[in-house]
Every structure is written in C-alpha cells, then in structure tokens.
Amino acid sequence: MKKRLISLFLILCLCSVALVGCGRKKEKADVFYYTFSDTYISSVRTALKKELTDRGLSSSDYDGSGSQTTQTEQVRTAVTGGAKVLLVNIVNTGSDDAATEIVGLAKNAGVPLVFFNREVSDGIVNSYDQCAFVGTRAEEAGILQGEMIGEYLLAHYDELDLNGDGRISYILFKGEEGNNEAIYRTKYSVEKANEMLMAAGKKPLRFYDESNKNEYLVDKNGQWSAAAANEYMTTALTTHNAANKNMIELVICNNDGMAEGAISALNAAGYNTGAGAPAIPVFGVDATEAAVALIRDGKMTGTVKQDAAGMAKALALLAANATEGKALMDSTGAFSVDETVRKIRIPYAKYFGE
C-alpha cells in the first residue's frame, strides 16, 4: 500500500510539472524587414527563423515593403501589443529621423531594440542602453570586391580588353541612394580596383557612358533589384556592344540580385550562358544561393560573401538575452564588437566558387 501511494504521488508530481511546462508561454521576437523581396534579406530571414526556434523563441515577421511609414507603424503596433524584443532592419538610412522615432517607441516602453543589416549611427545606438546593432562594416564589401576585380583583371587583362584600347570599360549598378552599404560598395569597388591596376602599370577603369557624371546606375525604387539592373543592362547593350566595337567589358553590382538581372540581359545578348560561351566578368555581393549557382555554372565571376547565418546567430543571441532578462550584450565575446558602441560586426569574405 505504501509503495502504491508513493508511486501515485510521483505520478501526480510529474503531471504537475508537465502541466506547468505546457502552460508556459513561448517568448516571441518581433522582426521587421525593410522588404521581403530582397534576396539576401530572405536568406537572413530563413536563417533567423531557425536560430530563434533553436533557442525556444517564436517570431512574427513584418514586411516593410520599402516604406518607412509602414515599418514605423508596424513597430508602434508591436510595442502597443506588448512586444518583448524588436529586431529592426530599418528602411530609411539616409538620416537618423526614422531610427530616432523607433528608438523613442522602444525606449518609452522599455523594450530592447536591435537594428540589423542596414546600419544606424553610433549616436542612435548610444541613445538607449537597451539598443544594439548587428551588421557588417559598410566599406569592407567594397574593398574586397575591388580587390577581387583587380586580381581578376590583372590575370586576364588582354582577353578582357575586347576593343584593344588598353582600358577596361565598366557598368556599375547601385542599389540605393543614401544607403551607406551602397555608397561604400560603389566607391571602394572602383577605387580599390584602380589602385591595383595602376600599381601594375595599367590604366584605370572607365565608365562606359561618359555623359553619366555619377558613374553608376541606381535602382530608383531603392530595392537593389534584379529588374532594375536587367532594364539598365538591356538598354546599355543596345548602344554598347561588339558590333559597335565598344562592348562593356566589366559589370560591377552592389548585390547579387542586381548581378542576376545583369546576367539575364547578357544571356539575351549571347553572353555568360556557360559552357565556353563568350563572357563578361560580373561581380556581386552577398553570395546568395542563386549567385553561388551562377558562379558554379560559369555565368558569374565572383561575389563577396555576406554571412546570413552569422548575422542570424548574433541576432538570436541578443533576442534570447532580451527575453531572458539578461544584459543585451551578454555572451557576445565570440563576435567582433566595436569598442565604443554596441555594434556587432559580421565579417565578409571573397568568393570565386568552391
């Protein structure tokens, strides 16, 4: 009888524990993306879902659709609804106005806030002790891309100088105006390549359209899209081609999505189709699955890897810290963190293929 009572007591205890466990609410991270349509952001979103799940967190994802007004209202609604942590891939980066408003919403409610990918200023992060940023160093991608371009051109210069004028003509697709990543990728990709070319006794790159004083073509919708690059490239090839002896000899893209669009236009003109077909070197940034496949198939030259998985790991750690009541930057020693501001840096890497 005594043994039976003990067994019954143990069963009741186990049932009580199970009921408590079942009743415990799963904490949630509210994640705000500047747009779902960005290829790299889609890879971050997929990786982050997994990392949050592995840490026992659920998530609600919001599509800003490229509108800061939409995103700010989404954040406001989430805060009003009792959000525990906000992960924000901000839409507008041209000024601090939007970030300031979002910080105000989070700070007034005491909700931890992490900006990611699209960088906000140090002043924004330091304005709230429960705010941080996870992303890359904006200039690094441009420098690495420029090095890749310089290395490749110097190894294949004569065959790439299609009209034999001793200079390489290029077209460059910029993802967005006013965005630090786009600004620095545009600037340093060309500057670094020129530095290497001139050190080797070669002439600097020449933008294909001398009437374009900006020396880039920008996605006017700020979406870094394949469609914008495809349209620009298709138009450019109607006047700059082999028949006119002024073929564009190099394509530089701020991201892999734009590289995909440019390659589609080149394919239509008989270039970059793989299997020994004539090819124009195309460089991107992100190392998306599509770009990796294009490089493998000989249709794209190289890209700069932006580590979506690494970014997701850092974001999930900070989200877990926030929901568990820990210091926001707890256990971040394995990451590269700026000395004077709570900014975690995810490194880039060159990628020419496996």
Predicted stretch roles:
Residues 18-21:
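C-terminal motif of bacterial Sec signal peptides marking the signal peptidase cleavage site
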Residues 28-47, 51-52, 60-77, 81, ...:
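Extracytoplasmic "Venus flytrap"
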Residues 40-54, 141-145, 180-207, 211, ...:
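Short, solvent-exposed amphipathic alpha-helices that sit
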Residues 55, 164-169, 173-177, 181, ...:
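Hinge/cleft segment of the Venus flytrap/periplasmic-binding protein
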Residues 65-138, 256-259:
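Beta-alpha junction/loop-to-helix N-cap segments that form part of ligand/metal-binding clefts
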Residues 71, 132-165, 184, 226-233, ...:
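Hydrophobic alpha-helical segments within soluble ligand-binding/sensing domains
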Residues 85-109, 113, 189, 211-292:
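Hydrophobic alpha-helical
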Residues 102-140, 144, 156-169, 173, ...:
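Flexible loop/hinge segments that line or gate small-molecule binding clefts
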